């Protein structure tokens, strides 16, 4: 009985949907987190009767067919790269991007990866790093005697040395854009990796046309909407229950047939 296998695909799909929703809710306070959404597509179809062919008496063309679907499959889990709200932290090393763009980060193995989380700090040598100690690209080293640091909206890094009246420029941040941000691969630790689907990074200066502005003393919060997640959670739960009832009904029908054959 095909209803059993069809409903089973529905239960599997809703289980994955539930896992995606659970991960969104778990990361509701994760800086720069981008909400994920499960995408589904229908499976193959089985033709019981084709449309557009002669009828049994060969006197007319059948206008509609009988084609039965065989269930559902997961086609993608898409990260929605929508701007999150900004939170004022008062920390000079906290940076938010307003608009399209990604901070570039170098991992210990030399790979350049990308993040929207601008929770930065300096390491023992004054290099600008992430909270996990990964270096920001291009590299910026803050002098030990700097008494003030300023990140402009265009990514210039300025410091005040001692009691100097003027700021000195010590670096320039650049950010990366991608033609297909949905093609980036999430790695964990708020990092994403480029893939053939995302295309190569387009590197530019903040505040240039098509590139985000940098906002100092702010962080971009998660773009998860709690109300929507709870609504989606209830919808997924109901869909799972309905598929479960179909399996139960199909099992009862099969039991009835088996009983009548005895």
Swiss-Prot record:
Keywords for this protein: Bacterial flagellum
Compartment(s) of residence: Bacterial flagellum basal body
Pfam families the record matches: Flg_bb_rod, Flg_bbr_C, LlgE_F_G_D1
GO biological process: bacterial-type flagellum-dependent swarming motility
Main location: other
Keyword ATP-binding: no
InterPro entries: Flag_bb_rod_N, Flagellar_basal_body_rod_CS, Flagellar_FlgE/F/G, Flg_bb/hook_C_dom, FlgE/F/G-like, FlgG_G_neg, LlgE_F_G-like_D1
Subunit (UniProt): The basal body constitutes a major portion of the flagellar organelle and consists of four rings (L,P,S, and M) mounted on a central rod. The rod consists of about 26 subunits of FlgG in the distal portion, and FlgB, FlgC and FlgF are thought to build up the proximal portion of the rod with about 6 subunits each.
Family: Belongs to the flagella basal body rod proteins family.
Name of this protein: Flagellar basal-body rod protein FlgG
